[in-house]
């Protein structure tokens, strides 16, 4: 279907000049205009993309955001600082413990509260597990969307072991809600058991699973053809657009907030 504007469209100024700007971008011969999302399993109802396709290659994408507004700010007005942690978990259910830590860290900074060294260590370990949890799904879901189902299953299998750790410390697998202002929900049930679970995952399971996922994807000709050289971001572009984390480092930006400006 061709891409058309409506009077309710908020991202374009509906003047003649703006419509002229779109000429040549719609109904182009040999190009396919695809309306992707928001009601699509891969978008999770968070955004809509109007894609211009040349075969499998996306030539242009016009994003439309704003579908995820859930009134979080208004909800926060009726909760205290510790109750709100439950909502932060839902903001990013892929790695909820990271949002728990970020929320209470912000409150503690405003209130000038210092954490004990033990609390900082526990939060740091859980934060890193949360990042691994996030990246496993990121790579796995990308593989799934590009036709490499097995890589997705490998990633999800390893995430289950992080869920086991979260369940052990908090009693909740999916949304641990473990942090509190100035500390944690409670101390580790058993430090020795916690250490064994973490070491088993990081030193035994994860190195093998990462190697397996890497082999599955890097030797998958279809997957490689669909990603190699596509959508590359230069170091200069990454810096100009303020990319952070793995995206920035993959583009050659030697920047890691945990080392450059530690917050725990």
Predicted region positions:
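Active-site bordering "gate/hinge" segments
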Residues: 1-48, 52-264
